[in-house]
Amino acid sequence: MTEKARTVSDLTISQAIFELSSPFLENKSQKALDTLFSAIRDHDLAPLYKYLSENPKTSASIDFDSNFLNSMIKKNEEKLAEFDKAIEDAQELNGEHEILEAMKNKADYYTNICDRERGVQLCDETFERATLTGMKIDVLFSKIRLAYVYADMRVVGQLLEKLKPLIEKGGDWERKNRLKAYQGIYLMSIRNFSGAADLLLDCMSTFSSTELLPYYDVVRYAVISGAISLDRVDVKTKIVDSPEVLAVLPQNESMSSLEACINSLYLCDYSGFFRTLADVEVNHLKCDQFLVAHYRYYVREMRRRAYAQLLESYRALSIDSMAASFGVSVDYIDRDLASFIPDNKLNCVIDRVNGVVFTNRPDEKNRQYQEVVKQGDVLLNKLQKYQATVMRGAFKV
């Protein structure tokens, strides 16, 4: 018997747990609770219900009902008995392959009811016995799903490192495509927006990992990651004019601020960009389980990209004009630009006496000179290390 995936995705569950446990998202707690209880009730997620009732961050929101829990446990055990029977039948009537398939189906059921402890244990047993690469890959996907549900990103990263060589060795097209979604989300969570954008944008047109997250969230994460990492030309082709993006963003009211933010930056509507960036910060960054840790960095980097885009067209620009373009005060622009200049995040200088921003973009010769100096320093360090090694050898003789 094969276990059907539940209709509620893994990241929908983990996002609801995040919203329920965050003290800053009290306005979303009731909706999160409704989402969780709908999934728990419809799919008999007894392990998840037990976890929520025992977790200090969520227990206060749970009106614990032992009878409800016991009724779900009973249904789980009845279902597990069917899987055990299938394993026994395979052992008596079939070969090792059929036994492993039956074990994998039981592991999939543990994954679907969010039973991490028993699910991981059975996945490990199946992985060790499996000889086919495809079976090993599927088992690792199940373990990654369980780690995602409980937001254990350290384990997700470890499992992905274990999974990638197996995919390269014997993964078919469908499994390779699934990996893009699984890995793209992880890379975004560790602030590797460039890597995340490459994978998520690439898998949008062939996305099939609905067990992990809904399609519109893949598009949303792809747009967010791409907006901060792609150059202007790629933003146009891969986001602004993308058929997949155009099929999702305009159709979802919740994504209107994200769509407006990307378009206003591309169209050089900087005051509109600043307004919509504030909305994106509130509605897409601070309230997201993966992006909340990076929202300050993200907003700051997007402002820097906007400043760089405007200054690229000028050798000099008055601070008054720049402030008017962004719809903010002169003092704000002065302070914000100054925060980027010391680290060379913006190639400009501010003349406060005359109220002018001068760009100082390095030309190609300067760039080549800096590269030669850098390579020379590396070579000099290597020669010094080599000399020290030779001298130590001479002293020993």
Curated annotation (Swiss-Prot):
* Record bears the keyword Aminoacyl-tRNA synthetase: no
Q: Which SMART domains match?
A: PINT (SM00088)
Keywords associated with the record: Cytoplasm, Nucleus, Proteasome
In the record, biological process GO terms are:
proteasome-mediated ubiquitin-dependent protein catabolic process
Q: Which residues form the PCI domain?
A: 192-364
Gene Ontology terms: cellular component: cytosol; nucleus; proteasome regulatory particle; proteasome regulatory particle, lid subcomplex
Q: Its principal location? A: cytoplasm
SUPFAM superfamilies assigned to the protein according to its UniProt record, in alphabetical order: Winged helix' DNA-binding domain
* Purpose of the protein: Component of the 19S cap proteasome complex which acts as a regulatory subunit of the 26S proteasome, involved in the ATP-dependent degradation of ubiquitinated proteins.
Family matches, as PANTHER family: 26S PROTEASOME NON-ATPASE REGULATORY SUBUNIT 6 (PTHR14145:SF1), 26S PROTESOME SUBUNIT 6 (PTHR14145)
Q: What is this protein's record name?
A: 26S proteasome regulatory subunit rpn7
In its UniProt entry, the species of origin is given as: Schizosaccharomyces pombe (strain 972 / ATCC 24843)
